[in-house]
Amino acid sequence: MVEYMLFICSDPTAPEYVAAEDNIVEWVSEMEARGVARHGDRLRPIEDATTVTVRAGELLVSDGPFAETKEWIAGYDIISCANLDEAVEVASKHPMARFGKIEIRPVWPLGL
C-alpha cells in the first residue's frame, strides 16, 4: 500500500460550493470502511496563515500564505491505496472534487 496526501483546494472557476451537497461524512465513512482513510481535516482560512522563513540566520514571520493566489488549500486527507489508480478513484468520490480541485501526491517517507 502507498500513502497519498490529498490536498483539497479551492477553485474559483468551479461551481459554487453548496453545503447541502457536501457529503463529507458519507465519504469518510465509506473510505474508512474500505480501509483507505488514514487522517484528514479542514484548514482555517488563508487569513489565519503564518509563513516562516529563515535566510542567512534571520527569521522572517509574515501573515498569510506564501503565495498570492485565488486558489488555496482548504484541507487535506491522507489515504493508503494499492496504486495511483485507486487514489484517483478515491479522490474522485471526495465531495470537494465537485467544488474545487484535489491534488494527489505520494508520501515520500523519510525512512527514519
Give the location of each predicted region.
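Conserved, structured core segments of small domains
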Residues: 1-112
